[in-house]
Amino acid sequence: MKPYLRSVLFIILVSFQAHGQRAKDGNYTVTSANSVLNSYTTLSSNATIGQSLISVSSNALNGGFFTTNLAAGDLILIIQMQGTSMNVDTYAASEYINSNGQFWGPYTTPFGHQNDWPLFIPLWGEITAYNQTGKFELAQVRSVSGTATINLTCPLTNNYAISGRVQIVRVPRFANLTINSNASTVPSLWNGTSGGVLAIEVDGNLILNANGKISSSGYGFRGGVTENQTLGAPSGSVNDVGFCASHVATQGAEKGESIAGFYTEYDLVYSRYCKGAPANGGGGGNNHNAGGGGGSNVGSTTLTYTGKGIPSITYNTNWNLELAGMGGSNSPGGGRGGYSGSTSDQNENTLGPNQMAWAGDYRRKEGGLGGHPIQQDNTRIFVGGGGGAGDQNNSQGGGGGRGGGITFLKLYGSISGSGTIEANGANGINANPNGQIAVQASTQKYGNDGAGGAGGGGSVYISNTNPIPNTITLSANGGNGGNQQLSVGLLATSPTNEADGPGGGGGGGYISISSGTPIQQVNGGNSGTTNSTQVINFPPNGATAGSAGITNTNTNFFDILAANDTLCAAGSVTLNASTIGNPPAGNLIWYTSAFGTTVVATGNSYTTPVLNTTTTYYIGICPGSFRRPVTVFVGGNPSITGTPTIVGATCTSSGTITNLTISGGTQPYSYSWSNNGGNSLNLVAPAGTYILSVQDALGCSSTSIPYIIPGITGPSLNVSSALINPQICNGTMGSISGIVSTGTNLSYSWTNTANNSINPSGLSAGSYVLTVTDGNGCTASSPSFVVPYVAGPM
């Protein structure tokens, strides 16, 4: 047997791999911005560990890059987006509703704090159980059935609940992928059931050119939507504390979407509005005109969460007027939204919030809280939480920004270039969302509402075989909070200048890779600001930045290595395979087909039966998303036949051997002649003995009998008996004699004389060289003969 070494065999191997396996979608270049490559569907029935089929809404999945329906060998990503449980006690709201407003109130509380909830607002919405949220796995398709079933080559490793919005993402399997400069690929927008996830597998090289992007920035969970309802200002006492959550829109703005759900789920627990943060979603700004909180993603769960984000240290004096020690504090998660509205110009450097002198809504601490930090878990990945909306009553408020999505890459080759892979949160929407500018001589007034909180950073998850270089940038930053952009005409009615709440910054996201030194950014987003001249010395006006996310190198990767083999006659061979990286527990499994269930062996080696024809086996491991093809090529030795035509070599030209015939084996052939004869079938060489070796594409070979290229001998000169007579002063001329030559049709030529005799006479003193030429034009030359001169007496 012969090892599979030749480059042509590599081409054959790739063709086997590409059939229903990695690289099946070929090479691809992204040339335009915002190209969508994935296609999406949703799980339609709960799925459990060990299942090898899933039920989906549609198994066509022929959108995005794909023009054909899902088929065997395709790759899917299964991920549960939501389904988290959070700390919400609905007792007060349900009693309020059931009693027609006679008891309790239109609000919900943290568990255990029905009566003292104002002291424990940060507990509202904290994550109590993740359930299956964020669980994910790659799976290879074995087949599809009907229009709604996908059969898998490996059983599921996770449970999935459809109540948690499980989506199925079809993943392109590229051989090589190039992202051109200024081009980008993005997912579909998360729409509440699918989207927000960009997933790609590349078997070979990923080239990410300058300004090229693989991005899910702003494609994640949705921000809270503004509604033009509020209680007005002031709605009560200066020290009133707004609700954590309520089902009544006049109490506050809508919360951002989170891993616990969105308005459908929030409505079920009477908690769609107000400042409490639902899991990693930002809280909505409370009335009147407070800013929305920023969404979040993974973050520190050892630091105490207050929902207040990170106050800018530039304004520690102002923060400490709100609460001693607040300046320099750090709450993980998203940033808080800014204070509620004020209409009186006071000194913000000496007068804190919740003071009657501010008028309006007293500039109360009613901004939406930043999203709760998610506990890092290597078995889960999350979308960034949406920002909470700003409270509005003038249709000038800003909605919350979308969270960053998930950028998921499986890379078996190298990555190069200087582009960006990102999943940043989107900025919160400004108060005055359309950027209108009031005409000076008018009553126009724009921007007089609360701004939206930013989206939290999403997740960049890369399983890479080779290290990611430091020329690549990975980014999962939180977005920046929305700004209050006031623009008021000179004839506007009072209040002509008011300060409302900017949005909180989004918390940083999550980056996980296998290895490398890329630039990694998981920064929290900045708070928004206000341009109101009432708080010119404190533009954040109560809004804070989001905290940083987390990066690590915990992403697992593995690959299966195996070499093909060759038999030049029917026989058996032992094939070997190994793994690199961090494969799942369990043995390698040898199959007879790429997607079938027939197992022929387990373990790292397999001895085949006697094979008469070329046969391919497939090695996989479960859980896993591919099988590696291993081919045993069965061939025969090539034959060398024919009577060669041999032309002898001469002193002026090489000889040749031609007209041999090669047959059998597997083309193309390679040739090698002995004695450095060259690597072509037809030989051109000096006289000598030569043997031809022929190797076919499978490495099988044959050698010929020896072939002789004869040589044609040229003339020769024997000068050993040469006699030189001198020229003498008495007139006797010199001569050269005794030279013997061999050859046919010889002619002679001497230097320095016209004499053409082999033994010339009549020579003057001097130096002479003889050249003899035969009938074939071959020559031989003598050494130089010197005829002396003998002078007379002096």
What are these regions (language model features)?
Residues 1-23, 622, 637:
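Bacterial Sec-dependent N-terminal signal peptides
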Residues 20-21, 538-794:
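Proline- and Ser/Thr-rich low-complexity, intrinsically disordered segments
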Residues 21-134, 145, 149-151, 181-196, ...:
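Autoprocessing Asn-cyclization modules and mimics
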Residues 50, 66, 72, 135, ...:
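Repetitive beta-strand solenoid architecture
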Residues 54-55, 143-156, 223-228, 432-435:
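Short, solvent-exposed secondary-structure boundary/capping segments
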Residues 64-82, 158-178, 210-213:
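Extended Gly/Ser/Thr-rich low-complexity repeat segments
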